[in-house]
A protein has these predicted regions:
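Phosphate-end processing signature that detects enzymes handling 5′-triphosphorylated RNA
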Residues: 1-211
C-alpha cells in the first residue's frame, strides 16, 4: 500500500475533431517525450446506495498502465486529491486493507461493482529545460458501462477527454506557481477545442451524474 499521493490535475471534454496541440514553449515546457499509448480497464465498487460516491470517494481495481492495482480516491482538497494505491490481488475480491481504509464510511456494508471504465490513453510527458518532468498530458478515449442493478444497467457511454496532471517538476513551488502553469496549458488547450468537463470525474459520467 502507498501512503497516498496528492494528484493535481485538470480535465477537459473534447470532440472528435479536436487535435492535441504542441505545448512546447508554453510556460516552462521545453520538450515532450514520445507519446506512450496503453489501455486501462477499471471496475469501480460502491454500496448499492452509492455511499462512497455521495461522500466523493471512489474505489476501483484497475488493470493496465503503470499503476495497476486497487485505488482509493479521497474527496477533493483545496488543491488536488489524495489517492491511495494497493496491490491488485487476485480477482475482484476487495482486499482487507482496502476495506479497512473504508471502514469509517461503509463499515461492513456490501460493496458491489457499479461501473466499468475502459480507456485507451495516449500519454505524453512534458519537461522543462533541465529535463525535469512537469506534466503528463493524456488523451483519453473512454468507454464506460453502468453496472448497477436497475433500469440503467448496461448503459454504455463513450467520450474523449484531455487530462493534465502535474508531475514532480510541476508540483514544486507555491500553489500560485502550479496554478500559473496549469492556466498557461489550459489556455493553449482551450484554443485547440478543449471545454470544461461535463462531469466531475469519469465515474460520475459513467453513472450519468454531474458531480
Amino acid at each position: 500500500m502507498s501512503g497516498g499521493e496528492v494528484e493535481i490535475e485538470r480535465k477537459y471534454d473534447v470532440d472528435d475533431e479536436a487535435r492535441m496541440p504542441s505545448l512546447i514553449g508554453v510556460a516552462r515546457v521545453a520538450s515532450a517525450d514520445a507519446p506512450d499509448a496503453f489501455d486501462l480497464d477499471a471496475t469501480y465498487f460502491d454500496t448499492p446506495e452509492l455511499t462512497l460516491a455521495n461522500a466523493r470517494v471512489a474505489v476501483r481495481r484497475r488493470l493496465g498502465g503503470h499503476d495497476a492495482g486497487w485505488h482509493i480516491k479521497w474527496p477533493p482538497l483545496a488543491e488536488g486529491r489524495r489517492e491511495q494505491q494497493f496491490e491488485p490481488g487476485e480477482g475482484e475480491a476487495i482486499p482487507d486493507e482496502v476495506r479497512a481504509a473504508l471502514a469509517e464510511l461503509v463499515g461492513d456494508a456490501r460493496l458491489v461493482p457499479i461501473a466499468r471504465i475502459r480507456n485507451h490513453r495516449i500519454a505524453t510527458v512534458l519537461r522543462d529545460s533541465a529535463g525535469e518532468p512537469l506534466i503528463e498530458l493524456a488523451d483519453d478515449h473512454v468507454v464506460a458501462t453502468d453496472l448497477r442493478e436497475g433500469p440503467t444497467s448496461g448503459t454504455e457511454r463513450r467520450w474523449q477527454e484531455w487530462e493534465v496532471e502535474l508531475l514532480p517538476g510541476g508540483s514544486a513551488g507555491e500553489a500560485s506557481d502550479r496554478a500559473a502553469l496549469l492556466d498557461a496549458v489550459e489556455e493553449r488547450l482551450v484554443a485547440a477545442g478543449a471545454q470544461p468537463p461535463s462531469s466531475g470525474s469519469k465515474l460520475a459520467r459513467a453513472l450519468g451524474l454531474s458531480r
